[in-house]
Design a protein with these regions (language model features):
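Conserved beta-sheet core of the metallophosphoesterase superfamily
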Residues: 136-199
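Core catalytic region of metal-dependent phosphoesterases/phosphodiesterases
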Residues: 11, 15-122
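General small-molecule cofactor/ligand-binding pocket signal
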Residues: 13, 89, 123-128, 140, ...
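Residue-level preference for short coil/turn positions at secondary-structure junctions
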Residues: 7-9, 39, 84, 135, ...
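Short acidic low-complexity segments
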Residues: 117-134
Length: 199
């Protein structure tokens, strides 16, 4: 789909974990439709843009793709996201960070790796960072968090409203209120194809 022109920068489209090349068919089009429906001028990818299943620390499917084949397919699929959403703030997720973790495990200097932008051939208008703030709300992937209360616990720790992804089976909003403020923790859904061998 063609990029959405315009949009209110105060309206934020959150793209859930895509885990390319294992994203659910039609998820990109769904996100683009939501962007237009709600006039979203700010786009945030909550992280785990790619899966990196072949280099995961978890057990792998021996009949799955090689690391090179998976990487090339993931990069090809990510180009569709770049074309549809040219300006994105990306929260680096645990799967995005796997190449850096593997370099650390091997005892190699992290400087030997390229940046996320270079690795995934993303446009310069995709801003890669672990945390982004938009209108007083923190957006982070949620690495290391778990359970129904993960996002509201993150909001409590951050002392401000917080949005996370990471938890494929949780999608909720919880609130914390005091005499001084009201903050929320939001866990967004994800765009994975749960039938793919990687899951």
């Amino acid at each position: 789909p063609a990029p959405y022109k315009g949009g209110n920068p105060n309206n934020v489209l959150i793209i859930g974990d895509t885990h390319e090349p294992f994203c659910k068919e039609g998820y990109l089009e769904f996100c683009r439709d939501v962007q237009e429906q709600y006039d979203c001028g700010t786009v945030i990818h909550i992280g785990d843009t790619v899966d990196n299943h072949a280099i995961s620390y978890h057990e792998k499917d021996v009949k799955g793709m090689s690391a090179g084949d998976e990487w090339n397919m993931a990069k090809a699929k990510m180009k569709r996201w770049y074309n549809t959403f040219p300006n994105v703030k990306v929260c680096i997720g645990n799967h995005d960070a796997l190449p850096f973790r593997k370099v650390f495990t091997a005892g190699l200097p992290v400087e030997w790796l390229k940046s996320y932008q270079e690795l995934l051939e993303s446009p310069r208008t995709w801003e890669w960072d672990f945390v982004h703030q938009v209108n007083g709300v923190i957006y982070q992937h949620g690495t290391g968090m778990s359970g129904e209360m993960a996002a509201v616990n993150a909001a409590r720790e951050n002392r401000q409203s917080t949005v996370i992804g990471h938890l494929h089976t949780v999608c909720n909003t919880r609130f914390l209120a005091s005499y001084k403020d009201l903050i929320f923790g939001l866990t967004v859904g994800c765009g994975i194809d749960h039938k793919a061998y990687a899951f």
